[in-house]
Amino acid sequence: MTWLDLPADHPYGIHNLPYGVFSTPGTEPRVGVRVGDHVLDVGACAQQAGMESGAVWLAPSLNAFLAEGRQAWSAARAWLVEQLTNEVHRECVEANLVSVDEVTMHLPVEVADYVDFYASEHHATNVGRIFRPDSEPLTPNWKHLPIGYHGRSGTIVVSGTDVVRPSGQRKPPTEPVPVFGPSVRLDIEAELGFVVGAATRLGEPVALADADEHLFGVVLLNDWSARDLQAWEYVPLGPFLGKSFATSISPWVVTTDALQAARVPLPGQDPEPLPYLHDQPTDDGAGTAYGLDVHVEVDWNGTVVSRPEFRDMYWSPAPSWVGSSCRYGSGSGS
């Protein structure tokens, strides 16, 4: 229970507590935690409480906090819950709550590397039918390992940032040669993005059993896609300018600790992956290869056009990072 006046079903109750970076007029960006319809200025609260690690909350991104690793993340969450449930801390917390209407949200993470995965069988099949109508929609390797490509971390922006329609080469089917101009087939992809915290050393890639130690949290992600540019450029090395002009992410990062109760088993995989990618979870979704009981709703000009369920993903986030070396602040799309 919390002393905060929050409805039991509020999406930003004490069981969530996502992190973000915010500012108020005349102040520098700093770390905050969403609590109900307010943002808790964590740095100010931590300083008043005499926390030695308070400096990480005054930074303009979550990167310094991400670098501290799983033990520090869990300890910080426990401290936050204590602040919000114990009346002893009420005065300090209330003094450092800011209405969400009074803040500007910023990109929560300085993104080090970015990989966009192709983990949904339904999506991969549909895209394959569009781009390769005369071939099998799934390539032979798709069910054997997670497919991804390195995107452009420098064009990841916080949700609400204006997106400029890209220009590039495209080859209309009725034209003998390509033409240059603005994309006429601008598309969206509703995804979850995963934020990596603890880094690995070069040459020591992530193992499946350790993946949870590196995954810090989840954001909503829109993978903007210029389909006409993409279709012309992607052979043989994959997407480039058609997928690298903008990727929008939500300002709030929901931690993997907060999503423990949302873990569910993956759908069956056939053929079974090689052992280094295979970890069969229990019925409660335990293990490292798990799905999430989360759905995304896509509303297009007032009409809901899609409600994809993340639990239906063929590849989960943990196997997707296996074999990679990663830096804190790295991210991936689903």
Spans of model-derived segments:
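Active-site microenvironments in enzyme catalytic cores
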Residues: 1-24, 34, 40-307, 319
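Glycine-rich N-terminal segment of FAD-binding domains in flavoprotein oxidoreductases
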Residues: 26-28
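Short, surface-exposed charged micro-motifs
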Residues: 31
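Extended C-terminal subregions enriched in glycine
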Residues: 305, 310-313, 318, 323-334
